[in-house]
Amino acid sequence: DAQESRGLGDVYKRQPLPYELDALAPHISKETLEFHYGKHHQTYVTNLNNLIPGTEFENLSLEDIVKKSSGGIFNNAAQIWNHTFYWNSLAPKAGGAPTGKLADAINAKWGSFDAFKEAFNKSAAGNFGSGWTWLVKKADGSVDIVNTSNAATPLTTADKPLLTCDVWEHAYYIDYRNARPKYLENFWALVNWEFAAKNFA
């Protein structure tokens, strides 16, 4: 579950990573995770905890804050949610191709898994500036690729997120400098299709 935990009368905490910091190497290095998870993700958590005391949001779940807030509270809450979802979208020694009903839905939409990957890469490479590229399940049960900018997330729409790729520069700059397409190429070796399939079910 991508929900952040809260202590008793306490603040939001970062979800622990579902793997060790070096588990995604060589595709995503330990150093990237030290900065991305250890610093960027943590900063959003710290910011949110500074912003919500005394507001209508202080006792809400993270998902509810994302759905009901705007401005700085939304930006930080959504970035926490998006990052936790991204960490769960990845796994060591993962990749490969989806199976079952999710594979059927992907094939129904794009004709083949390779055609889907090409469409996803093109969408993610063309996602201007900072943002996220998502595989989502539409209300009618079909799947689609959606780009969001900055902290925006499908959580505030009728789409159900299945997996995401973080295309903020901090997700890949240490390992790939400005070569986002190279990062995307390596992303597929880490995709956690089990997580995506659970979200699709």
Where are these regions (language model features)?
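Single conserved hydrophobic/aromatic residue that forms the stacking wall/gate
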Residues: 1-12
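Feature for soluble, non-membrane regions of globular proteins
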Residues: 10-201
